[in-house]
Design a protein with these regions (language model features):
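Catalytic phosphate/metal-binding cores of nucleic-acid and nucleotide-processing enzymes, i.e., regions
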Residues: 1-156
Length: 156
């Protein structure tokens, strides 16, 4: 089975929602009570990041599946934006993660799928062309090593 990998280094953790305010990216925050204008602003910033990292002229046959590999520290849930600056400290030895992978993965999966359509790589992200998607977390020791690897799995 042939695969194409797209790498998205140092993916954004927060997006700017006003001059001085940032919001951490997450599916729950995006769709649970956020004003639709703010939601549009957030989605636009995520799409801009995705669009900048999708190679031009990528040619794939459909249908495809996708798999998102998320590389992030085990304590990714404790990443904060303070006065416009990201803050993170390595976890202590007995740290137990308490954040949901789904909240991080869903927003990226949707944006990456949309990015393939926008780049004319995929005609549409309906089940006719995109038949499966999944995701996995891989823990890294340093926050600066965070990245997304989006595998396009050629099903034919």
């Amino acid at each position: 089975m042939q695969k194409t990998e797209l790498v998205f280094p140092k993916f954004p953790t927060h997006v700017k929602v006003s001059k001085t305010k940032f919001m951490k990216l997450g599916y729950n925050k995006l769709y649970a009570g956020v004003n639709h204008f703010v939601r549009e602003k957030i989605v636009k910033q995520v799409h801009e990041y995705v669009d900048a990292h999708i190679p031009k002229g990528l040619d794939i046959s459909t249908p495809i599946g996708t798999h998102l590999h998320i590389y992030a520290p085990i304590n990714f849930g404790s990443v904060r934006m303070v006065k416009g600056k990201l803050t993170w400290k390595p976890p202590h030895d007995r740290y137990k993660p308490n954040w949901d992978l789904d909240n991080l993965a869903f927003i990226w999966l949707k944006s990456l799928n949309d990015g393939l359509v926008k780049a004319n790589i995929l005609p549409d992200d309906t089940v006719e062309f995109l038949t499966s998607t999944s995701y996995t977390i891989h823990f890294v020791d340093d926050f600066e090593d965070r990245k997304l690897i989006y595998e396009i799995i050629h099903e034919q």
